[in-house]
């Protein structure tokens, strides 16, 4: 798997993501600077990592979405390439038009930084094939603006098309207000594009891939991507 990680000023999770991808694929990802206008030839996966691109000025992800490299990412996605955006990366994908909706301030207006439980809603996508449908996984979050919102028509379309891949839940998989950490509509933690090739999620699976981290539940996402791309080759 040949992956490329975008790097913007203020991003701080690119090395964590590189470690997770390297462990899963055995290949070192390429780092792509925000001012570049092309992706490396043969790229299979583009990752937009977490952090605080451009200091979160204007809106989270708003400036990064207009960086030169994003034109290449939009073209890559329109051609069917796989794109993963995590935390600030999710915000950037929404701001760039690759995903619908917006990430708002957390409902309690506080920065959240701890492990959460997610329910995997389906297992037949490149981003979830490493899990079972209904499986509960534990991954960290670290955000102040992770409250996913969209208009009612968009939310109905996301639900009807099965495009919600991850939801906040309890340790036993129960979804509800008590387990919705940031107030996100329908407890949404991660969604995919219409074609299913672009995923945005607020939690950080890359931070739970080694036993020394206390949990390895994030491995499934990366292992599934490697398996999908190997079969598609």
UniProtKB/Swiss-Prot annotation:
Part of the phosphoribosylformylglycinamidine synthase complex involved in the purines biosynthetic pathway. Catalyzes the ATP-dependent conversion of formylglycinamide ribonucleotide (FGAR) and glutamine to yield formylglycinamidine ribonucleotide (FGAM) and glutamate. The FGAM synthase complex is composed of three subunits. PurQ produces an ammonia molecule by converting glutamine to glutamate. PurL transfers the ammonia molecule to FGAR to form FGAM in an ATP-dependent manner. One of its GO terms (cellular component) is cytoplasm. Coiled coil: none annotated. HAMAP family: PurQ. Its EC number is 6.3.5.3, 3.5.1.2. It comes from Rhodopseudomonas palustris (strain BisB18). Its main location: cytoplasm. It is found in: Cytoplasm. GO terms for biological process: 'de novo' IMP biosynthetic process. Pathway: Purine metabolism; IMP biosynthesis via de novo pathway; 5-amino-1-(5-phospho-D-ribosyl)imidazole from N(2)-formyl-N(1)-(5-phospho-D-ribosyl)glycinamide: step 1/2. The active site is at residues 87, 204, 206. One of its GO terms (molecular function) is ATP binding. This is Phosphoribosylformylglycinamidine synthase subunit PurQ.
């Amino acid at each position: 798997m040949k992956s490329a990680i975008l790097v913007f000023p203020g991003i701080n999770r690119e090395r964590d993501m590189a470690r997770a991808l390297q462990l899963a694929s055995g290949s070192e990802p390429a780092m792509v600077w925000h001012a570049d206008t092309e992706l490396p030839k043969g790229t299979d996966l583009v990752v937009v990592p977490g952090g605080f691109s451009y200091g979160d000025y204007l809106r989270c992800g708003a400036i990064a979405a207009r960086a030169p490299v994003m034109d290449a990412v939009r073209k890559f996605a329109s051609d069917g390439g796989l794109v993963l955006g995590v935390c600030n990366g999710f915000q950037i994908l929404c701001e760039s038009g690759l995903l619908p909706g917006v990430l708002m301030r957390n409902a309690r207006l506080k920065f959240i930084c701890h492990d959460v439980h997610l329910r995997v809603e389906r297992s037949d996508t490149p981003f979830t094939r490493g899990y079972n449908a209904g499986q509960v996984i534990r991954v960290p979050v670290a955000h102040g603006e992770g409250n996913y919102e969209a208009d009612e028509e968009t939310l109905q379309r996301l639900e009807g098309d099965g495009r919600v891949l991850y939801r906040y839940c309890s340790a036993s998989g129960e979804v509800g207000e008590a387990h919705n950490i940031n107030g996100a509509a329908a407890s949404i933690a991660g969604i995919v594009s219409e074609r299913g090739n672009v995923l945005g999620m607020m939690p950080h699976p890359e931070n739970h891939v080694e036993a020394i981290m206390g949990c390895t539940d994030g491995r499934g996402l990366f292992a599934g991507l490697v398996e999908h791309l190997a079969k598609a080759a």
